[in-house]
C-alpha cells in the first residue's frame, strides 16, 4: 500500500512544480512590439523600399547594359542586387500589417518568410563568394583561365548559392506556424520567423543556424581573406579599388546584421545568461526588434556604396542619367561592351 501511494505523490509533486514554473512565466506578460512597429516601421520601410527599389534596379540595368557580365565580380554584384530586390518585396507587406494590423493569411506569411530568408542567406553567401573570388584573383589561383571560362565558371556557384539559400530556409518553412492574436492569424515582423519556438531544441537550432550561416561564416571568411590580402596588396595597385569596394560591402553587411545576430542569440539562450526576468526579457525583445529593423534597411545600402567606391559604376550612372535627360540620345556614344577600356578616358571627366 505504501509503494502504491508514494509513486503518485512523487508524480503529483513534479506536476505542481511544473505548473508553478509556468504560472511564474505567465506573470511576465509578453513584450508588445505593436506601438514601436506602428511608429517606426511604416515611414522607415516605405523610404527604404522606394530608395532600394530604385537604386537596385539601376544596379541591374548598369551591370547588364554598361559594365557587362564579362567579369565574375559583376555577375556576383548583379546577384546581390537580385537578393536585395527579393528582400525589398517583403517591406510593403510589413508596412501594411504594422499600420492596419490586418490578417494576411497563412499562405502570404509563408511567401514573406521565403522571400525574407532566401534574400538574407543568399546575400550572405554572395558576399562570401565575392570575398573568396577577390582572394583567388590576388593570389592568381585562377590566373591561367580565360575570361570567358572564368565567367562560365561563376554561373555554377551562383546557381548553387540560390539552391543552398532555399535549402537553408526549408526548416523555417516546415516548422512555421502563424501566431494567434484576437482570434486572427498574424505573421509578426517583430518576432523571429521560426515559430513554433516553444520547442527549445528548434529555437536553439534555428538561432544557431542564423548566427553561423548568416553572420559567423561571412565574418570568418572576410577576416581570413582580408588579413592574407592586406599583406600583399598595396595602395594604388591594380585591383585596389575593387578590393576596397568588396571590403566595404562586407564590412557594412557585418556591421548592420551583427547586432541583430547578437540580440537574437541572447534572446534564444537567455536562460543560460541569467536574462530570463521580465525586464531582461522585454529588453531583449525590444533590442531584437530594433536591431532587426536596422538590419533590414541594409537592402538599399549596397548601391550607394557602388556610387562612393566604384568609379566605373559612378561614370556609367552619370552617362545613364545623361541619356535619360537627353531628348535626342545617341546610343553609339556608349557601346554596351566598351566599359573597361574606356574607363581611363572617362575618369578624366570626373
Curated annotation (Swiss-Prot):
Disulfide bonds join 109-187. GO terms for molecular function: C-C chemokine binding; C-C chemokine receptor activity; CCR chemokine receptor binding. InterPro entries: CCR1-9-like, Chemokine_rcpt, GPCR_Rhodpsn, GPCR_Rhodpsn_7TM. CDD domains: 7tmA_CCRL2. GO terms for cellular component: cytoplasm; external side of plasma membrane; plasma membrane. It is a multi-pass membrane protein. SUPFAM superfamilies: Family A G protein-coupled receptor-like (SSF81321). Receptor for CCL19 and chemerin/RARRES2. Does not appear to be a signaling receptor, but may have a role in modulating chemokine-triggered immune responses by capturing and internalizing CCL19 or by presenting RARRES2 ligand to CMKLR1, a functional signaling receptor. Plays a critical role for the development of Th2 responses. Lacks the conserved DRYLAIV motif in the second intracellular loop that is required for signaling of functional chemokine receptors. This is Chemokine C-C motif receptor-like 2. It comes from Sus scrofa.
Amino acid at each position: 500500500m505504501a509503494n502504491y501511494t508514494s509513486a503518485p505523490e512523487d508524480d503529483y509533486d513534479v506536476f505542481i512544480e511544473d505548473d508553478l514554473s509556468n504560472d511564474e512565466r505567465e506573470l511576465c506578460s509578453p513584450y508588445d512590439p505593436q506601438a514601436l512597429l506602428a511608429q517606426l516601421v511604416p515611414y522607415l520601410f516605405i523610404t527604404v523600399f522606394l530608395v532600394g527599389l530604385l537604386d537596385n534596379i539601376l544596379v541591374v540595368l548598369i551591370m547588364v547594359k554598361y559594365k557587362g557580365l564579362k567579369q565574375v565580380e559583376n555577375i556576383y554584384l548583379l546577384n546581390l542586387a537580385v537578393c536585395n530586390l527579393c528582400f525589398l518585396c517583403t517591406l510593403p507587406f510589413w508596412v501594411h500589417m504594422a499600420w492596419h494590423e490586418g490578417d494576411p493569411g497563412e499562405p502570404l506569411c509563408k511567401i514573406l518568410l521565403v522571400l525574407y530568408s532566401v534574400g538574407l542567406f543568399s546575400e550572405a553567401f554572395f558576399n562570401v563568394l565575392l570575398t573568396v573570388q577577390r582572394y583567388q584573383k590576388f593570389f592568381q589561383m585562377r590566373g591561367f583561365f580565360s575570361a570567358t571560362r572564368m565567367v562560365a565558371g561563376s554561373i555554377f556557384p551562383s546557381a548553387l548559392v540560390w539552391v543552398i539559400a532555399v535549402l537553408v530556409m526549408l526548416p523555417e518553412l516546415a516548422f512555421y506556424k502563424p501566431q494567434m492574436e484576437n482570434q486572427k492569424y498574424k505573421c509578426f515582423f517583430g518576432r523571429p520567423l521560426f515559430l513554433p519556438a516553444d520547442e527549445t531544441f528548434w529555437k536553439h537550432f534555428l538561432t544557431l543556424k542564423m548566427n553561423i550561416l548568416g553572420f559567423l561564416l561571412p565574418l570568418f571568411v572576410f577576416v581570413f581573406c582580408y588579413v592574407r590580402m592586406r599583406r600583399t596588396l598595396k595602395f594604388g595597385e591594380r585591383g585596389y579599388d575593387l578590393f576596397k569596394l568588396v571590403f566595404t560591402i562586407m564590412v557594412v553587411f557585418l556591421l548592420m546584421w551583427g547586432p541583430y545576430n547578437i540580440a537574437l542569440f541572447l534572446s534564444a539562450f537567455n536562460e543560460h545568461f541569467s536574462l530570463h526576468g521580465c525586464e531582461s526579457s522585454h529588453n531583449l525583445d525590444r533590442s531584437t526588434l530594433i536591431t532587426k529593423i536596422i538590419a533590414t534597411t541594409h537592402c538599399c545600402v549596397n548601391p550607394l556604396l557602388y556610387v562612393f567606391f566604384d568609379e566605373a559604376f559612378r561614370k556609367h550612372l552619370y552617362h545613364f542619367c545623361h541619356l535619360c535627360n537627353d531628348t535626342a540620345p545617341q546610343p553609339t556614344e556608349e557601346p554596351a561592351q566598351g566599359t573597361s577600356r574606356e574607363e581611363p578616358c572617362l575618369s578624366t571627366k570626373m
